[in-house]
Curated annotation (Swiss-Prot):
Pfam families in UniProt: RraA-like (PF03737)
Superkingdom per UniProt: Bacteria
InterPro entries, alphabetized: RraA, RraA/RraA-like, RraA/RraA-like_sf, RraA_gpbac
Family indicated by similarity: Belongs to the RraA family.
Protein name per Swiss-Prot or TrEMBL: Regulator of ribonuclease activity A
GO terms classed as biological process: regulation of RNA metabolic process
Subcellular location: Cytoplasm
Amino acid sequence: MDYSTSDLCDHFADVVDVLEPMFINFGGRHSFGGRIKTVKCFENNELIRELLSQDGTDLVLLIDGGGSTRRALIDIELAELALENNWQGIIVYGAVRHVDEIEELDLGIQAIASIPVAADSQGAGEDGIGVNFAGVSFFDDDFIYADSTGIVLSAEELELEIVEI
């Protein structure tokens, strides 16, 4: 479903948190959202691969990469894996690579930067935990909505059908 985060902020100002404006759209789907699954890992994407291998129907993977821009946590292989397993999108507090290929996919991907250097795959990290970045605290099963204007978070699913676009 396409929507505008600006309209969501107008209609749901009392129930949404707005992330600080630091994210860039890299995926081919510019409006995406869903229930979040959290993962925290630093310059290492093995746990990300494990999560994206699971069914992601109506889910957005929210990655706390510590804001590191030294190594890309998402590459074309992981983005294609997410698409194959029906993930709505990925939000990375960190970097991505293979940007030209990723923008061709019908998948929402936002991150703070791109870099050609790959992440390690040592298996370190935690999933299903609360994380905090961009001025907001995130928990598994919160709802996130993203577009080219910004990203908003809600503890409950928003009734998008009442918003006129």
